[in-house]
Structure formats: structure tokens, C-alpha cells
Amino acid sequence: MSGIDLEKIKEETIAALNELLEAASLKAGDILVLGCSTSEVSGGVIGKASNEEAGRTIVSALLSVLEPKGIFLAVQGCEHINRALVIEKESQEKYGFEEVSVVPALHAGGAASLAAYNLFKSPVMIEHVRAHAGIDIGDTEIGMHVKFVQVPVRLKTKYIGSARLTALKSRPKLIGGERAVYEKVL
């Protein structure tokens, strides 16, 4: 037994995801990146108490919402695999991401990336992704994986279990000078 309320973790995860989806206006084919410390979710210190049940619960909850919408999930691993990500082969091929050779493990990748590797239909590992939005559970630092320009999204859901929750969306760069127009003129 993990000592955490997995049903509550599932509910918090889905609530946070739905808030982000509304704010980020993601569409089919877009990518959402997850960074997740199940150690933090369980009340421990990041990297010290990986929890397989929590990882499986969180990834399954995200997939239950994202898959019907055609949104791809990329799951960041920990520093021990250089923050490589698990992603579906379909997404890797669509975006031309370079595949790398590593398989996530509980203490080298983490419980969430291990869960994704086991739950995805055709998982591959990549080194970098340019996701359209992201959820960070437990301060894992996902900014490097969200495309420029990253915009923080303040969610009503502040925690998943004991882990702090942050989220990002992205927008196109605003370029030009004083004469630039940023809204479409029809």
C-alpha cells in the first residue's frame, strides 16, 4: 500500500488538466509535457521515494482525457536519464524528434516516465520536445520542454497529493517594433 489516496490523486490530476486545457486551447496533434515527482506527491523529497502506483495513477488519468482529444502526452524523466522523455512513436515521427536509447526505470527516469513507457501503445524515448503546454507536479522544471514563449498558467488546483503544481502554456513570439500589429486585421 502506498499510503496515499490514489482516487484523490486521480481527481486532482484530471481537475488540473482540464483547467490547463481550457487556458491553453490545445487541439488534436498538440503535445502536453508532464514533469512529475511521485516522491513529492507522496510527501517525500524529490528523487528519494518514487511511487509506482502514483505514477501509474497520474499518467493513466492524463491519458484518459488527452487520448480522446488526440493530444499527445510526453513524460519527462529525471536527471539520471538527462530528462529524456517518453512519447508515442506517432508523435515522435510527426514532429521529427530524434529517438534516443534509454529505458526508464523507477530510480532512473522515475515512476511517471516508467508508467508512461508501460502504458503507451508504442513508446519511444527522445531527448528534447517542443510541447505546446505542460504540467509540472513537484517542481521538476519542465520549462526546457515547452516551446517559446512560455506563459505561466495559474490553476485553482495547487497540489497533486503533497506536490506543488505549476503549469505552462505557450504563445507565438510578438515581434516587430512600434508599428507592429498583434491582432489580426480582417
Curated annotation (Swiss-Prot):
Family: Belongs to the UPF0340 family.
InterPro entries: Antibiotic_NAT-like, DUF436
Species name: Treponema denticola (strain ATCC 35405 / DSM 14222 / CIP 103919 / JCM 8153 / KCTC 15104)
Alphabetized SUPFAM superfamilies for the sequence: TTHA0583/YokD-like
NCBIfam families assigned: TIGR01440 family protein (TIGR01440)
Protein name as catalogued: UPF0340 protein TDE_1278
